[in-house]
Amino acid sequence: MEISYHGHSIVKIQTNGKTILIDPFINGNGQTDLKVAEEAPDIILLTHGHNDHVGDTIELAKKKDALVIAPNELANWISWQGVKTHPMHIGGAKEFDFGKVKFTQAFHGSSYVTDTKEIIYMGMPAGILLFVEGLTIYHAGDTALFSDMKLIGERHPIDIAFLPIGDNFTMGPEDAACAVSFLQPKIVVPIHYNTFPPIEQDPQIFADLVQNSEVQILKAGEKVNCF
């Protein structure tokens, strides 16, 4: 299995002959190394409906009839664009042929802005727990710090956590470090920073605040060093 980070909130997981993309915001993302023309995922996981997370989902999914797994309202809207979807909701889990997915709480918003500047409500934002090949991966999506992160870590011991540190729209470095203390992952990767001026951060500040977890600061395209 290979797990790699690709700028902003994009994570790629290659497992059991399948490619999974989380929040594939590629076009317009100056931090990513990916190109839409070169990607053809089998599975796409979405945390919420903001444009910088839905990104290029529809175009990517149509390449090889990929399954898009997303919060209910977002999944329904994407299905209306001619894409195969599986809707889920916070607290729900589902076994798939590639592994198990469980949606968790996140404190954020979720809406999509169309080309005509219409704002479409996309339901509740979520974090994602992914259980593959004996590993538990937590992608927090966009979120503030919340105390039930302790419960997430207690219920599902986490091997790798991807946490936003950009501040302004999500947790900043200090709150993200507190989130690490709640979740207690073996490895944590900072995400959702330096894409736009309001979320410019030095990830080393976050790393210096973290205790008892290994911080891996990854450039776009770099792989997580898994044990």
From Swiss-Prot:
Q: Does the keyword Zinc apply?
A: no
Q: Name one GO molecular function term.
A: hydrolase activity
| Any Pfam family | Lactamase_B_3
Superkingdom field: Bacteria
Question: Gene3D superfamilies, from UniProt?
Answer: Ribonuclease Z/Hydroxyacylglutathione hydrolase-like (3.60.15.10)
Key words of the record: Hydrolase
Q: Which family does it belong to?
A: Belongs to the UPF0173 family.
Q: What is this protein called?
A: UPF0173 metal-dependent hydrolase Bsph_4138
Species in which this protein is naturally found: Lysinibacillus sphaericus (strain C3-41)
